[in-house]
From Swiss-Prot:
This is DNA replication licensing factor mcm5-B. PANTHER family: DNA REPLICATION LICENSING FACTOR MCM FAMILY MEMBER, DNA REPLICATION LICENSING FACTOR MCM5. Belongs to the MCM family. Keywords: ATP-binding, Cell cycle, Chromosome, DNA replication, DNA-binding, Helicase, Hydrolase, Nucleotide-binding, Nucleus. It catalyses: ATP + H2O = ADP + phosphate + H(+). It comes from Xenopus laevis (African clawed frog).
Amino acid sequence: MSGFDDLGIYYSDSFGGEQPVGDDGQAKKSQLKKRFREFLRQYRVGTDRTGFTFKYRDELKRHYNLGEYWIEVEMEDLASFDEDLADYLYKQPTEHLQLLEEAAQEVADEVTRPRPAGEETIQEIQVMLRSDANPANIRNLKSEQMSHLVKIPGIIIAATAVRAKATKISIQCRSCRNTIGNIAVRPGLEGYAMPRKCNTEQAGRPKCPLDPYFIIPDKCKCVDFQTLKLQESPDAVPHGELPRHMQLYCDRYLCDKVVPGNRVTIMGIYSIQKSGKTSTKGRDRVGVGIRSSYIRVVGIQVDTEGTGRSAAGTITPQEEEEFRRLAVKPDIYETVAKSIAPSIYGSTDIKKAIACLLFGGSRKRLPDGLTRRGDVNLLMLGDPGTAKSQLLKFVERCSPIGVYTSGKGSSAAGLTASVMRDPVSRNFIMEGGAMVLADGGVVCIDEFDKMREDDRVAIHEAMEQQTISIAKAGITTTLNSRCSVLAAANSVYGRWDDTKGEENIDFMPTILSRFDMIFIVKDEHNEQRDMTLAKHVMNVHLSARTQSSSVEGEVDLNTLKKFIAYCRAKCGPRLSAEAAEKLKNRYILMRSGARDHERETEKRSSIPITVRQLEAVVRISESLGKMKLQPFVTETDVEEALRLFQVSTLDAAMSGSLSGVEGFSTQEDQEMLSRIEKQLKRRFAIGSQVSEHSIIQDFLKQKYPEHAIHKVLNLMMRRGEIHHRLQRKVLYRLK
């Protein structure tokens, strides 16, 4: 009998459906249902002058005729009609929502008459709730709010497949075949406890055994349901803590409304379920009263187009006026750039480029259904100690949606999406990674060069197509990842070596071409600059505690964050005809200049100027226009975008760091490399070792250029054919 005790005590008359209600309780229920019915039938919007419309009556009729058996009720409308009704619904939503749905069914019956033949039976109506009240946080939900209506924002990180749940069941006794039908099952994740005994008394036959009942599937009434996993918003997570999760239960028309990665605000009933079977051992009996919480969803609002946690929706008219005044200032571009990481000295062009990344260009949907990304991707390469990681940390805090991750601790699944087993249903479910959770914002990836090549390849699609396609464990789907990527990396040798050219960087051109701007950050030795920098750092340390207000000409962090969210939501500038003409002419000049350079040097350039670079300049121009809330991009914006592109990607390309995979583009160069490699392999067999200095000296005597010898050695090391030993003095051949 120990198992019986663990499951709680149930009475044999529990199959009678709901608990019997006294006359007073029944009368009160009827009275409340009547008031709900009056609300749905009589609530109207409009004035005497413009005329009234019956909001919910008309909506019920329209939805019912379209075959959509649901209606969305605003809690503010209910409160303005009858304050007590709204209070009942907030404090005891489980029973009163049922009354509201019954009232909606009766009103739908009235407004849809006469119905066609065969449709005489009125369908059940699902009522969804919506409220403009301030949302709470997952970590603020306490036991006092149990069984109350709550409003919670967050990100959907996992969704199960849609399954069926019985709302009314029929059971039959195995022994005497006695059937009990139409037993109501409570909504949510609560199950139904089968009666232990059959009470049917028949003379002359033995008594029915214990646990005789089984469910008749054909006579059950079922609805669709789906469970979701909600994670709290990143900006609501205290520093150093893990984000909290909450299980959600959706049924009927609320199923399949969201996918992992969606930012949502849900209205639901804070409920509890039994937290699994407790152990039969005595020491675990203390957990008999413990229940795990979940939210039974009664309304979902999805933040569309990932504009940044609906930040624009919470902006007051006074703030909007302030933002419009800010946008028309002639020096807004410099002001925003100055406000980005003000504690970091210099790096003006990088800060301006980060400002463009935060505002982003305009996403375009073409007539054939394809899209062109509007987000700007930025890569910072260079020396340690140049505040790359500090800039990344600031952007994570400043962006409306920001996710920070480090390359060494990030896997392909963690960045894109993973498929795992649901511990309850044992079905496969999908969980979105960093780039899915940052949909509509910025992903900051530090130590980009420390990532494994396989993991780095996983974000190719996310960076250009802005989607993540999954085909594993029987799940084939596409998730949105409409986010900018801000990455920071060190060079291969730790510090940037100008003599090494493209050997400083170990990235494939496939990933480099996806970055709109690539900055090489060098720690240059300049006495005047070092003096100014040291003075700035000392000032930051001395005034770290005292300085609270923002410096003149800067925007404080919260205002900047709201301004970025407002501009992203309200403005999507396009190129003006003059700006497009100017950009076209400059692109043709860049292409012809590259062609002339190839003709003069009789060598094909390894730095291509392609359409992808042209689109990058367009995106930068649009972000400059968005900063000023302009509908069209001007020639001045195009000039500045071309200047930024020149000081970043083109300068990096001219330094030789973005050349092809081999770095040698002519046929003669390739033949020379293969000759050096063949001679090198002949020099020492597999498993032997030789001094690197002597190898280089031998090849130099044969008049081979030193950079070509180093290139071959680096290539062979990358392929795992040789590696260094004895403090990089000796080469050892592996294969």
